Amino acid sequence: MEKLRRVLSGQDDEEQGLTAQVLDASSLSFNTRLKWFVICFVAGIFFSILGTGLLWLPNGVKLFAVFYTLGNLAALASTCFLMGPVKQLKKMFETTRLLATIIMLLCLVFTLCAALWWRKKGLALLFCILQFLSMTWYSLSYIPYARDAVLKCCSSILS
Protein backbone atom coordinates (compact mmCIF):
# COMPACT_ATOMS: atom_id res chain seq x y z
CA MET A 1 0.00 0.00 0.00
CA GLU A 2 2.88 2.32 0.82
CA LYS A 3 4.44 1.73 -2.59
CA LEU A 4 1.15 2.56 -4.29
CA ARG A 5 0.92 5.76 -2.26
CA ARG A 6 4.48 6.72 -3.30
CA VAL A 7 3.80 6.05 -6.97
CA LEU A 8 0.56 8.04 -6.87
CA SER A 9 2.24 10.97 -5.15
CA GLY A 10 5.03 11.01 -7.73
CA GLN A 11 7.80 9.51 -5.59
CA ASP A 12 9.81 6.68 -7.10
CA ASP A 13 11.49 3.79 -5.33
CA GLU A 14 14.72 5.00 -6.95
CA GLU A 15 14.64 8.11 -4.76
CA GLN A 16 14.66 5.94 -1.70
CA GLY A 17 18.11 4.87 -0.52
CA LEU A 18 19.22 1.28 -0.22
CA THR A 19 19.15 1.40 3.58
CA ALA A 20 15.59 2.71 3.61
CA GLN A 21 14.51 -0.01 1.19
CA VAL A 22 16.06 -2.72 3.38
CA LEU A 23 14.47 -1.29 6.51
CA ASP A 24 11.10 -1.04 4.73
CA ALA A 25 11.31 -4.64 3.62
CA SER A 26 12.23 -5.95 7.06
CA SER A 27 10.12 -3.71 9.28
CA LEU A 28 8.21 -5.41 12.07
CA SER A 29 4.81 -4.52 13.44
CA PHE A 30 4.68 -2.59 16.70
CA ASN A 31 3.34 -5.62 18.57
CA THR A 32 6.17 -7.80 17.28
CA ARG A 33 8.72 -5.14 18.21
CA LEU A 34 7.23 -4.86 21.68
CA LYS A 35 7.26 -8.64 22.20
CA TRP A 36 10.91 -8.93 21.16
CA PHE A 37 11.82 -5.95 23.32
CA VAL A 38 10.30 -7.69 26.35
CA ILE A 39 11.93 -11.03 25.45
CA CYS A 40 15.39 -9.49 25.06
CA PHE A 41 15.05 -7.29 28.12
CA VAL A 42 13.88 -10.17 30.33
CA ALA A 43 16.66 -12.37 28.91
CA GLY A 44 19.14 -9.61 29.74
CA ILE A 45 17.94 -9.41 33.33
CA PHE A 46 17.92 -13.22 33.59
CA PHE A 47 21.50 -13.54 32.30
CA SER A 48 22.72 -10.76 34.58
CA ILE A 49 21.12 -12.36 37.65
CA LEU A 50 22.36 -15.80 36.61
CA GLY A 51 25.86 -14.42 36.20
CA THR A 52 25.69 -12.82 39.63
CA GLY A 53 24.63 -16.16 41.14
CA LEU A 54 27.51 -17.92 39.41
CA LEU A 55 29.96 -15.46 40.93
CA TRP A 56 29.83 -17.29 44.26
CA LEU A 57 30.77 -20.67 42.78
CA PRO A 58 34.40 -21.78 42.78
CA ASN A 59 36.03 -20.38 39.64
CA GLY A 60 32.72 -18.72 38.77
CA VAL A 61 34.22 -15.36 37.85
CA LYS A 62 34.58 -16.38 34.20
CA LEU A 63 30.94 -17.46 34.00
CA PHE A 64 29.89 -14.32 35.85
CA ALA A 65 31.73 -12.07 33.40
CA VAL A 66 30.34 -13.89 30.37
CA PHE A 67 26.73 -14.01 31.57
CA TYR A 68 26.77 -10.48 32.95
CA THR A 69 28.12 -9.13 29.67
CA LEU A 70 25.62 -11.24 27.71
CA GLY A 71 22.85 -9.79 29.88
CA ASN A 72 23.94 -6.24 29.16
CA LEU A 73 24.17 -6.94 25.44
CA ALA A 74 20.67 -8.45 25.44
CA ALA A 75 19.28 -5.46 27.34
CA LEU A 76 21.00 -3.12 24.88
CA ALA A 77 19.69 -5.12 21.93
CA SER A 78 16.17 -4.94 23.33
CA THR A 79 16.01 -1.23 22.62
CA CYS A 80 16.88 -1.92 18.99
CA PHE A 81 13.48 -3.55 18.65
CA LEU A 82 11.71 -0.46 19.96
CA MET A 83 13.40 2.19 17.86
CA GLY A 84 15.18 0.15 15.20
CA PRO A 85 18.88 -0.70 15.00
CA VAL A 86 19.93 2.23 12.80
CA LYS A 87 18.19 4.81 14.99
CA GLN A 88 19.57 3.12 18.11
CA LEU A 89 23.13 3.32 16.77
CA LYS A 90 22.65 6.97 15.78
CA LYS A 91 21.36 7.80 19.27
CA MET A 92 24.17 5.85 20.93
CA PHE A 93 26.81 7.95 19.21
CA GLU A 94 25.21 11.38 19.70
CA THR A 95 27.48 13.83 21.50
CA THR A 96 25.48 13.60 24.75
CA ARG A 97 25.95 9.81 24.89
CA LEU A 98 29.27 9.34 23.10
CA LEU A 99 31.51 9.10 26.16
CA ALA A 100 29.12 6.80 28.03
CA THR A 101 28.75 4.60 24.94
CA ILE A 102 32.49 4.27 24.39
CA ILE A 103 33.16 3.49 28.06
CA MET A 104 30.30 0.99 28.14
CA LEU A 105 31.49 -0.84 25.01
CA LEU A 106 35.11 -0.86 26.20
CA CYS A 107 34.04 -2.25 29.57
CA LEU A 108 32.06 -4.99 27.83
CA VAL A 109 35.17 -6.02 25.89
CA PHE A 110 37.60 -5.61 28.80
CA THR A 111 35.36 -7.65 31.12
CA LEU A 112 35.54 -10.59 28.75
CA CYS A 113 39.28 -10.11 28.15
CA ALA A 114 40.04 -9.96 31.88
CA ALA A 115 37.98 -13.06 32.65
CA LEU A 116 38.76 -15.28 29.67
CA TRP A 117 42.22 -14.35 28.35
CA TRP A 118 44.06 -12.46 31.07
CA ARG A 119 42.53 -14.64 33.84
CA LYS A 120 42.46 -11.75 36.33
CA LYS A 121 39.43 -12.16 38.60
CA GLY A 122 39.78 -8.81 40.35
CA LEU A 123 40.11 -6.98 37.07
CA ALA A 124 37.06 -8.78 35.67
CA LEU A 125 35.02 -7.72 38.71
CA LEU A 126 36.26 -4.14 38.37
CA PHE A 127 35.24 -4.04 34.71
CA CYS A 128 31.83 -5.51 35.57
CA ILE A 129 31.30 -2.74 38.10
CA LEU A 130 32.42 -0.14 35.55
CA GLN A 131 30.16 -1.84 32.99
CA PHE A 132 27.19 -1.45 35.34
CA LEU A 133 27.99 2.18 36.10
CA SER A 134 28.53 3.12 32.46
CA MET A 135 25.35 1.30 31.41
CA THR A 136 23.45 3.18 34.12
CA TRP A 137 24.94 6.52 33.01
CA TYR A 138 24.11 5.70 29.39
CA SER A 139 20.52 4.76 30.33
CA LEU A 140 20.09 7.96 32.33
CA SER A 141 20.87 9.97 29.20
CA TYR A 142 17.46 8.98 27.81
CA ILE A 143 15.63 10.52 30.79
CA PRO A 144 15.48 14.33 30.65
CA TYR A 145 17.54 15.97 33.42
CA ALA A 146 18.27 12.60 35.09
CA ARG A 147 22.03 12.99 34.80
CA ASP A 148 21.88 16.47 36.32
CA ALA A 149 19.78 15.16 39.20
CA VAL A 150 22.23 12.31 39.88
CA LEU A 151 25.21 14.69 39.77
CA LYS A 152 23.51 17.10 42.20
CA CYS A 153 22.58 14.23 44.51
CA CYS A 154 26.13 12.85 44.51
CA SER A 155 27.69 16.27 45.02
CA SER A 156 25.39 16.99 47.96
CA ILE A 157 26.27 13.64 49.54
CA LEU A 158 30.01 14.17 49.07
CA SER A 159 30.03 17.75 50.39
Swiss-Prot record:
This protein's GO CC annotations: cytoplasm; endomembrane system; intracellular membrane-bounded organelle; membrane
Any GO BP: protein transport
Main location, first listed in the record: membrane
Topological domains, Lumenal: 58-62, 119-122
Localisation per UniProt entry: Membrane
Bilayer-spanning residue ranges: 37-57, 63-83, 98-118, 123-143
Keyword Mitochondrion: no
Keywords of the record: Membrane, Phosphoprotein, Protein transport, Transmembrane, Transmembrane helix, Transport
Entry membrane topology: Multi-pass membrane protein
InterPro entries: Vesicle_transpt_Got1/SFT2, Vesicle_transpt_SFT2
Positions in the Cytoplasmic compartment: 1-36, 84-97, 144-159
Residue numbers of Phosphoserine PTMs: 9
PANTHER family linked: VESICLE TRANSPORT PROTEIN SFT2A (PTHR23137:SF24), VESICLE TRANSPORT PROTEIN-RELATED (PTHR23137)
Function: May be involved in fusion of retrograde transport vesicles derived from an endocytic compartment with the Golgi complex.
Family from the record: Belongs to the SFT2 family.
Record-given protein name: Vesicle transport protein SFT2A
Organism this protein belongs to: Rattus norvegicus (Rat)
